[in-house]
């Protein structure tokens, strides 16, 4: 049986087989997996907010924001042998967990997180091979670097793989 490496909120980590990597509690947050299928290494970030400019402090958790988490994850993957040109991405989350009377853009955190992750991945030239984003239900995801499958358990909808 393989060991599961857990990634908390505003957290990230990397794995090699036989380990898998999992995060839970993806509501408006986005879970992003970057993997090198040649080296069989993978990393996951649990991103809470789209832009580090939203942070109020000089010192902040880089794993919390789309614009900084993906750079940090990339450097951790390269440190264990991943090649940037071989990296691919899968992502899930970005739900709209609550309905609001106004159409205030600030309340669309899930959609803004998804857009920020996609923008950053484009900047890094990392293709997104699969995604399961949006909706209004929370998700738990687990990635296996050996099979390259992302298992997604969505509240009230069951499980699927991408």
Swiss-Prot record:
What's in the keyword line of the UniProt record? Chemotaxis, Hydrolase
Q: Which InterPro entries match?
A: CheD-like_sf, Chemorcpt_Glu_NH3ase_CheD, Cytotoxic_necrot_fac-like_cat
Recorded catalytic activity of this chain's protein: L-glutaminyl-[protein] + H2O = L-glutamyl-[protein] + NH4(+)
| A Pfam cross-reference name | CheD
For molecular function, the Gene Ontology terms on record are: protein-glutamine glutaminase activity
The EC number(s) attached to this protein equal: 3.5.1.44
**Superkingdom, taxonomy of origin:** Bacteria
The keyword Calcium appears for this protein? no
* GO BP annotations listed: chemotaxis
The family assignment reads: Belongs to the CheD family.
Q: Briefly state the protein's biological role.
A: Deamidates glutamine residues to glutamate on methyl-accepting chemotaxis receptors (MCPs). CheD-mediated MCP deamidation is required for productive communication of the conformational signals of the chemoreceptors to the CheA kinase.
User: Oligomeric state and partners?
Assistant: Forms a complex with CheC.
What is the name of the protein in this document?
Chemoreceptor glutamine deamidase CheD
Organism of origin is Halalkalibacterium halodurans (strain ATCC BAA-125 / DSM 18197 / FERM 7344 / JCM 9153 / C-125) (Bacillus halodurans)
């Amino acid at each position: 049986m393989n060991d599961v490496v857990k990634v908390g909120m505003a957290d990230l980590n990397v794995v090699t087989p036989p380990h898998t990597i999992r995060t839970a509690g993806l509501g408006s947050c986005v879970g992003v997996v970057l993997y090198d299928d040649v080296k069989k290494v993978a990393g996951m970030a649990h991103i809470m907010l789209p832009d580090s400019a939203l942070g109020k402090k000089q010192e902040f958790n880089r794993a919390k924001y789309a614009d900084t988490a993906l750079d940090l994850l990339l450097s951790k993957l390269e440190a264990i042998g991943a090649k940037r040109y071989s990296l691919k991405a899968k992502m899930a989350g970005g739900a709209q967990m609550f309905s609001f009377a106004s159409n205030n853009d600030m309340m669309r955190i899930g959609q803004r997180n998804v857009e920020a992750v996609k923008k950053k991945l484009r900047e890094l030239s990392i293709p997104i091979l699969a995604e399961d984003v949006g909706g209004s239900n929370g998700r738990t995801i687990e990635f296996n670097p050996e099979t390259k499958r992302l298992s997604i358990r969505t509240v009230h909808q069951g499980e699927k793989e991408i």
